[in-house]
Amino acid sequence: MISPERELDSEREVSFERSPEDDAGPEDDMGSESNMDQEDGTNPESKLSAKDKRKRIRQELCWKHDYNDFMMGLLMKLFPLEELKRYLEASDTERPLNIRTNTLKTRRKDLAQELIGLGINVDPVDWSKEGLIVYDSPVPIGATASYLGGHYILQGAGSLLPVMALAPQPEERILDLSAAPGGKTTHIAQLMKNTGVIFANDISKERCRAISANCHRLGVINTVICHKDGRAFHKLMTGFNRVLLDAPCTGTGVAIKDPSVKATKTLKDVQRCSHLQKELILSAIDCVENGGIVVYSTCSILLEENECVIDYALKRRHVKIIETGLEFGRPGFKKFEAHRFHPKMELTRRFYPHAHNTDGFFVAKLKKLSSKKKT
């Protein structure tokens, strides 16, 4: 899904360095505190103790939750300590399986009755019209007659949010710029009632086959599957009513699905993803008509992949942030350490496992005002 990675010039690297306090060695600590002691007469031991305590906590959390030091440093900047502990516990806890009803073939109520008849315990997702939570099942949930018949798709609850924010309408022309494996594409199709046209694009030819398979099983007939580099898609086709960019990311919000994320991601990985995301969001904006809508989402909770990408788009294209229409979630950051963002950044939405019982997600909704590019 992600295009071949390229080395970034130092001028283009985003700033996500750890603070000097976090990175200071013993000699740096001593020198810094000694200077402060000379100036204000305070006891350097108390300050060293506080720093040492924070470092020990960081090391303990890394050990307990299998994070590398870099990743834990980022998380400690995002959350107060007690909330960070709740986030880490929730992130390590398997959540119930979620499925999305395919309303092209059935109703959620009818699907629930079918599954209950098989001894499967389900409940509706209270903020979604299509979602069902599967608590336990005596049969493989991906091998029932209802599944094979296209009555539902396995899809995390958080993955429903970007399409809900997109709010596609019948007969529209919509682009899903990074579409594989097709969960969001088929969700868009059912909300459009199989009318209009969807262009489902992905850079990976292999993953395009997954889009095709899901469309076929779910009965989606209004979708054209494309195998192009999303960064250049605007050179091929424009004028879409709406564009969804569920961008490739580090996956920090879904570490339970890929625990290696916690131990292997580095500063360079974050920089590469952020750079790619910035290229993709400009292409997405250039693909949509004036007055059209772009929804940007990631399954990452890192600032550099979310608010920083939206801020980049605001500075280079004539777009504005608008309400997502989502009834829950935390506001995006208006300021964070040295970063100062547009006041409307609070209209973006952040989702966390410990607060919302979903995967970590970010959703932003933009409206295009003009095709002119900012310089």
PLM-predicted stretches and their roles:
Residues 1-375:
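S-adenosylmethionine
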